[in-house]
Amino acid sequence: MESFRYHDLGRIAYADALEYQTAAFEVLLDAKATGKKEDNQLFFCEHLPVLTIGKSGKDSNLLIPEETLRERGVSFYHINRGGDITYHGPGQITGYPVFDLEYWNLGLKQYIHMLEETIIRFLSLYDLKGERLEGATGVWLDPEVPGRARKICAIGVKSSRFVTMHGFALNINTDLSYFSLINPCGFTDKGVTSLAMELGVPQDFELAKSQLRSIFMEIFA
């Protein structure tokens, strides 16, 4: 029996995806409060261009006026996850695990570590060495090499009574030029990258989703 139900929302506006995961989050919270049984849920999607900023984020990390964003067709949301500002858009796998961590006897720190491990294992399929950066979340390449550290996957979550929402954003074929609009995750001295950038050619997006889903099933068995 699978430990979660998987949903591929396809390419979707941020607000619409937020409705899906918020509804699942509230159902799981209610189930915990009333003793009902509800399934954990994993949502994968690909967003239309959007910037989101977490509850600890600084507006100064948005480098252009919000009006200019709108003119460029980029949405902007303040949301209740951890972390600072990041970009979501086409070519990026955005994942929203709505999980009851008590199902796996996990704390929040362990959960984030397992999310990072999921991405690290995925990258190893492409002979890339994903690593953690001390004091930061997410998955990086060359995190300790001055001038070379670059993030390939951002992570920001919310947890209430050990039920999670929000999640990760993994750059596959992402247009990285959008990251020039922000200080990604609040960093001014580190870069961003994508699977396509590292390998030199666009990657099979559907294959990447399938591979990532399989690794989720292994790690969150």
Swiss-Prot record:
One of its GO terms (molecular function) is lipoyl(octanoyl) transferase activity. Pathway: Protein modification; protein lipoylation via endogenous pathway; protein N(6)-(lipoyl)lysine from octanoyl-[acyl-carrier-protein]: step 1/2. Pfam families: LplA-B_cat. Gene3D superfamilies: Bira Bifunctional Protein, Domain 2. It catalyses: octanoyl-[ACP] + L-lysyl-[protein] = N(6)-octanoyl-L-lysyl-[protein] + holo-[ACP] + H(+). Residues 36-221 form the BPL/LPL catalytic domain. The record marks K151 as: Lowers pKa of active site Cys. GO terms for cellular component: cytoplasm. Keywords: Acyltransferase, Cytoplasm, Transferase. It is found in: Cytoplasm. It comes from the Bacteria. The keyword Membrane does not apply. The keyword Membrane does not apply. GO terms for biological process: protein modification process. Its main location: cytoplasm. The active site is at C185. Its EC number is 2.3.1.181. Substrate binds at R81, G82, G83, D84, I85, T86, Y87, H88, A154, I155, G156, G167, F168, A169. Signal peptide: none annotated. PANTHER family: OCTANOYLTRANSFERASE (PTHR10993:SF12). NCBIfam families: lipB (TIGR00214), PRK14345.1 (NF010925). In the reaction, the free carboxyl group of octanoic acid is attached via an amide linkage to the epsilon-amino group of a specific lysine residue of lipoyl domains of lipoate-dependent enzymes. Catalyzes the transfer of endogenously produced octanoic acid from octanoyl-acyl-carrier-protein onto the lipoyl domains of lipoate-dependent enzymes. Lipoyl-ACP can also act as a substrate although octanoyl-ACP is likely to be the physiological substrate. Belongs to the LipB family. This is Octanoyltransferase. The gene is lipB.
